Structures are given as structure tokens and as C-alpha cells.
Amino acid sequence: MNEKIMSDQKKIEEAVYQLLEALGEDPNREGLLDTPKRVAKMYQEMFAGLNEDPKDQFTAVFSEEHEDVVLVKDIPFYSMCEHHLVPFHGLAHVAYIPSDGCVTGLSKLARAVEVVSKRPQLQERLTVQIANALEEALKPKGVLVMIEAEHMCMTMRGIKKPGSKTVTRVVRGICQSDKETRQEIIAMIHHN
């Protein structure tokens, strides 16, 4: 568990208590009595990726005779918008083209998504951080990361447009320089 967050649990509890008071609620009433503790515990889980390095997920690396696209698509994730501290959630699609047959376990791609999504985050940064981790750890010929997400800050407040999705993409290496490769990966992502 993230030591920094764990050591600040009491501080989080106090802040939630004060927030409830500032909202005009009675933090000592039965329904709210344990809320500060529950919220602090929830934040431990939701922000567990703060002190983790997504590159550490790529410890299992194998040499295989595979030089074509590796894609893990439709990876569900949840994160917290750093602007409003409300969730955004969606699907991540992570593709790479191995260099010299250097591949990783498929679950490692999902684990990297998990680590960077468990932070106060922006979708744009989330996309870049996944691509960076994959690129630095495996040194592939190309990387393409695409994320589609619904942001509760657009659904529950402000413009109130439920169901609207934000799509971000990072394309590197041969996936960027070779239009045909890029289009093939995007077609694979959209293929059911």
C-alpha cells in the first residue's frame, strides 16, 4: 500500500470532516459518523498509483519471434479528474510493435494502465504516461495508446452531457511514421 497516503490517512479524515461541516452537515450524525474514515480508505485505494512507476509493471519480458502488432484493447479503468476530484472512466487500448521480438506479458499492459489511472489525473497525461512507460521499458518499434472516457465533471455538473466521451491518443515510432500501420491498429481497436 502507498506509504505516503497511508501516513496521511488521519489528515484526509480531518479534511473530510471539515468538508462535511462546511457543507452544513453534521459529521457526527449516524449516517456520516464513519464517512471520513471510509473516504480516507477509498482514497488509499483510488490513489494507490501515486508512488508507483508504471515501468515496473514490465518486469516480465520475453524474446519471441513476433514482430507484428500486439494490442490489448478495451481495458476498463477508473481515475479521478484532478480538476474536480470526480471520477472519469472508460476504456484504454494499448498497442505496440515489438523490436527484436521483445514482448511482455499481456496483463502487464493492463497493469500499467491501472497504475497511472490510480492518481489524480488528466486523460491527456494518462495517455502519455502509458505510452512513455511502454516505450521506455520495451523500446518497441512503435506504440499507439488510445483512451475513450466519460468524465463525471461533464456528466454531473457544468455542461451536464451524460454519455459524451473524450478520446485521446498518443502515437510513436513506426505507428506514427507509417500511416498504414497506424490505420491498421485503429481498425483493430474498432473491430468487434
Swiss-Prot record:
Record EC number: 3.5.4.16
Annotated pathway: Cofactor biosynthesis; 7,8-dihydroneopterin triphosphate biosynthesis; 7,8-dihydroneopterin triphosphate from GTP: step 1/1
SUPFAM superfamilies, per database record: Tetrahydrobiopterin biosynthesis enzymes-like (SSF55620)
Keyword Manganese part of the UniProt annotation: no
GO biological process: one-carbon metabolic process; tetrahydrobiopterin biosynthetic process; tetrahydrofolate biosynthetic process
Annotated Zn(2+) binding sites: C81, H84, C153
InterPro entries: GTP-CH-I_C/QueF, GTP-CH-I_N, GTP_CycHdrlase_I, GTP_CycHdrlase_I_CS, GTP_CycHdrlase_I_dom
One Pfam family, short name: GTP_cyclohydroI
Catalytic activity: GTP + H2O = 7,8-dihydroneopterin 3'-triphosphate + formate + H(+)
UniProt KW Membrane keyword: no
Transmembrane region(s): none
GO CC annotations on file: cytoplasm
PROSITE patterns per record: GTP_CYCLOHYDROL_1_1 (PS00859), GTP_CYCLOHYDROL_1_2 (PS00860)
Alphabetic keyword roster: GTP-binding, Hydrolase, Metal-binding, Nucleotide-binding, One-carbon metabolism, Zinc
GO molecular function: GTP binding; GTP cyclohydrolase I activity; zinc ion binding
Family: Belongs to the GTP cyclohydrolase I family.
The protein's assembly and partners: Toroid-shaped homodecamer, composed of two pentamers of five dimers.
Protein name according to UniProt: GTP cyclohydrolase 1
